[in-house]
Amino acid sequence: MRKKRSAPQKPKVTYRVNGQIRVPEVRVVFKDGSQEIIKTSQAIKMAEQEGLDLIEVQPTATPPVCKMDNYGKLQYKLDKNDRDRKKKSKPTSLKELRFHPNTDKHDFDFKAAHLEEFLRKGNRVRATVVFLGRSIIYKDKGYELVERLTERLSTVSNREGSPKFEGKKLFVYFEPDKKKIEVHERMLAKMKKEQQNKEAEN
């Protein structure tokens, strides 16, 4: 089984600080936006006097650009941003279910419910209509099934483009819609509560 290739990770941002800055002079950008080229040793002393660190932010510039800041707080902020970025970039998996042009109502409802559940969990889904043997002559039934499925999943997703044929298979993709899912979840919770109240009355 072929392993999924993981996406390349961005290198963690690190800065040279105080004594790690080995160049003779640096360009210091002050909080008011002004800049000055001064000796590195002098810049470090100025930062220390303010209870701050001299941080090299543009090492490739000539001379390197530095600013005075609290390195611990800066690194904490960078780490937090990195964690947030990783959460947002978490890949969604693709779930697939297969149908046939003559899929009966029970089977259709069963599979559509599974696709809906996949979407509610944030997964992208693909529905494939498989045409076996001479059933390829019923392409219109395949398209009708896709339209029914699109309507059924519209409360939690958006269809990606138009359905496409590849050989004897008709593919259609759906992506989860967070706002729709939130509304759908609230509606389900309301219906469940109403049902519980009704049962309690009886």
Curated annotation (Swiss-Prot):
Pfam families: IF3_C, IF3_N. GO terms for biological process: ribosome disassembly. It is found in: Cytoplasm. Its main location: cytoplasm. IF-3 binds to the 30S ribosomal subunit and shifts the equilibrium between 70S ribosomes and their 50S and 30S subunits in favor of the free subunits, thus enhancing the availability of 30S subunits on which protein synthesis initiation begins. Monomer. This is Translation initiation factor IF-3. The gene is infC.
